[in-house]
């Protein structure tokens, strides 16, 4: 899978480290149609036809791989069969959870995780659902692709909000808050990734989401561009992240109830926006640099081989 470009970023970083890594997808992601090495292009209907393609792929790639790294709770063929086959073939398996695949689920519903050799979450906030995660490995960005432009001072700052899901990200609360403030608001939704990037590069302030306990890839990209980010954060996860990586989390934490209050200082102070934006870029370099993320994966792989 290649949700938010995660898988494609990972395999390219691993290849730069000398690892023979390939990304297999069932279908290309709509807004990232070129990001894959192997596209199964599964039939859109017909379970038996889909399974036939998936089983042929497993038969082809089983001899070629030492580790199968899966995403989002999905495996190449049904887990009840895929994992015993991997064990019988002496292949290792990793499951990387991405958020919606675990959020709100019980440990009993996620019991299948223990059948993998390792299971990963992307933030300490996610350990509320998977407290026994083998590792916490945050998403990575190739920072060579993210050069920030100098911030611009203006009377009406531009707030950008780019929800993948309007309801889940709390878009109505963002709209309501901005309506009470001297700002312009751009809600970026349902557009190709390249267009979304160009629009949030113009932002003075970025608001990520109001319902979850941690930020998403959009917030990471925004910080990489030097933008101050506002989102809902779990305080315990903030403390755990700062302890693990030795750096302050520079995101402004807000809820739907205090969003106006948290936005106002950033709106009033250009210098504060510059400072928080610079701290965000430094944070991403420390925690989300793709080369460092690849090193964390390589260390994990070595521990299970």
Kindly give the residue locations of the regions a language model identified.
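Conserved donor-binding/catalytic core segment of Leloir-type glycosyltransferases
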Residues: 148-169, 175-178
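A short alpha->beta transition loop at the rim of the catalytic pocket in nucleotide-sugar-dependent
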Residues: 204, 224-228
């Amino acid at each position: 899978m290649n949700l938010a470009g995660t898988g494609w970023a990972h395999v390219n970083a691993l290849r730069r480290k000398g690892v023979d890594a390939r990304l297999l997808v069932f279908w290309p992601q709509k807004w990232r149609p070129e990001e894959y090495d192997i596209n199964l292009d599964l039939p859109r209907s017909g379970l038996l036809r889909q399974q036939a393609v998936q089983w042929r792929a497993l038969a082809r790639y089983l001899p070629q791989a030492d580790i199968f790294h899966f995403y989002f709770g999905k495996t190449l063929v049904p887990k009840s069969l895929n994992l015993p086959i991997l064990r019988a073939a002496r292949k290792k398996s990793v499951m990387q959870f991405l958020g919606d695949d675990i959020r709100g689920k019980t440990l009993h519903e996620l019991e299948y995780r223990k059948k993998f050799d390792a299971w990963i979450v992307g933030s300490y906030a996610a350990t509320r659902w998977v407290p026994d995660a083998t590792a916490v490995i945050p998403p990575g960005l190739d920072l060579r692709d993210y050069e920030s432009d100098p911030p611009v001072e203006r009377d009406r700052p531009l707030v950008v909000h780019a929800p993948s899901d309007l309801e889940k990200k709390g878009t109505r609360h963002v709209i309501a808050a901005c309506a009470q403030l001297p700002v312009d608001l751009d809600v970026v939704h349902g557009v190709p990734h390249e267009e979304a990037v160009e629009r949030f590069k113009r932002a003075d302030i970025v608001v990520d989401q109001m319902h979850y306990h941690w930020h998403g890839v959009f917030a990471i990209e925004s910080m990489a561009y030097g933008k101050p980010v506002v989102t809902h954060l779990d305080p315990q996860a903030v403390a755990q992240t700062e302890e693990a990586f030795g750096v302050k989390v520079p995101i402004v934490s807000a809820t739907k109830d205090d969003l106006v209050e948290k936005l106002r200082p950033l709106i009033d102070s250009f210098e504060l926006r510059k400072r928080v934006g610079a701290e965000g870029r430094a944070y991403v370099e420390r925690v989300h640099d793709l080369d460092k993320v690849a090193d964390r994966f390589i260390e994990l792989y070595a521990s299970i081989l």
